[in-house]
Amino acid sequence: AGFAGDDAPRAVFPSIVGRPRHTGVMVGMGQKDAYVGDEAQSKRGILSLKYPIEHGIVSNWDDMEKIWHHTFYNELRVAPEEHPVLLTEAPLNPKANREKMTQIMFETFNTPAMYVAIQAVLSLYASGRTTGIVMDSGDGVSHTVPIYEGYALPHAILRLDLAGRDLTDHLMKILTERGYSFTTTAEREIVRDVKEKLSYIALDYEQEMIDSTVEKTYELPDGQVITIGAERFRCPEVLFQPSIIGMEAAGIHETTYNSIMKCDVDIRKDLYGNIVLSGGTTMFPGIADRMSKEITALAPCSMKIKVVAPPERKYSVWIGGSILASLSTFQQ
C-alpha cells in the first residue's frame, strides 16, 4: 500500500490476521482480539494465523476489512474519506467480489471515489508496455494474462492454483526428509524465509540433481543451524513440474504457452516477444533463463522469444497502480 506517484509502496506487510489461541492470563494487559500483518507475524507463537485472501480472491470479508482498516489507519495514517482509492483484483475475480469490495470502501470507509484494476495489467504498465503476456505469481495463485493494447483478453487468461504458499509447503515437506520438523503456522513462516533467501531455479533440473554438491546454512530464530542442499532448487522446480507435489496441472511455462495459443494468431508474435514476469514467486534466481528455454522448446522454431524479469517485479503491480493513479486522464 502507498501513495500514487511514489516509486515504491510505503507499507508492505503480509495479509494475515492472527487471533490469540488462549485467552489472556495477564490481567490488564489490554490484549487485542486480533492482530494484523507484521504484528501478527511477530506474535505468531501465541496466535492462530488466518489468510483472508485465498488463491488471490478474498474469502473472508471481516478479516479483509481489518486489513484495510490497518492499512489506512496504522500503516498509511490517512483518513480514507479524504482520498480516492485504487484497489487491485485477481484476473477473473467474480463480479460479486468486486461489488463487495466497492461496498466496503464506500460504506465502511466512506472513500470519495474508487477504481478496481486487474493486477497483471498494472504489472505490464510498470514494465512500460501495453502489449504482452504477464505471468504473475504471488502467494496463493498464478495467472497468465495476455494483454493487447492495454486490454486483458479474458478468453485467454489462465489460472494456476500453484504459487508461493505451495512452494513453502513443499519445502516444509522435503526439509522433514532431512530430519527437521516444521509443522505450525508460525514455523511455516520460517520456512518461507528459508525459501526466499536460499532457493533458485535450475536451468537443467536433472543435471543439477547430479552436479549439485553445494550446501548452504540457515540459522533458525532459536539459534539452531540447518543445512540445505538440493532442496534449494527442488523447491521452486514445482513451478515447472507441478506433478512433483501431485498436482495435475501444466507448469508455468506450459500455462504461458497455452495462454498465447488461445489468442488470435496475428498477435502471438507480440506476446512471445513480451513475456513479463511479476509477483513475489517469480523472484527466484534463474527463473527468466529457464522460462525462456522452456517456452523456446514449445514455440515455433523461428519465433523470437523474450522473457522480461524486471528487478522490481515483486511490487510491479503496485508500481503500475501508482503510475495509473497519478495520470491526470485517469483522475478525471
UniProtKB/Swiss-Prot annotation:
Q: List the disulfide bonds.
A: none
Q: Output this protein's name.
A: Actin-42
SMART domains named in the record: ACTIN
Note the Pfam families from the entry: Actin (PF00022)
Report the InterPro entries cross-referenced here.
Answer: Actin, Actin/actin-like_CS, Actin_CS, ATPase_NBD
Q: Which GO terms describe its cellular component?
A: actin cytoskeleton; cytoplasm
- Please give the CDD domains that the UniProt record associates with this protein: ASKHA_NBD_actin
What role does it play?
Actins are highly conserved proteins that are involved in various types of cell motility and are ubiquitously expressed in all eukaryotic cells. Essential component of cell cytoskeleton; plays an important role in cytoplasmic streaming, cell shape determination, cell division, organelle movement and extension growth.
Any miscellaneous information on file?
There are at least 13 actin genes in potato.
How would you classify this enzyme at the top EC level?
hydrolase
Q: Which UniProt keywords apply?
A: ATP-binding, Cytoplasm, Cytoskeleton, Hydrolase, Nucleotide-binding
Where found? Cytoplasm, Cytoskeleton
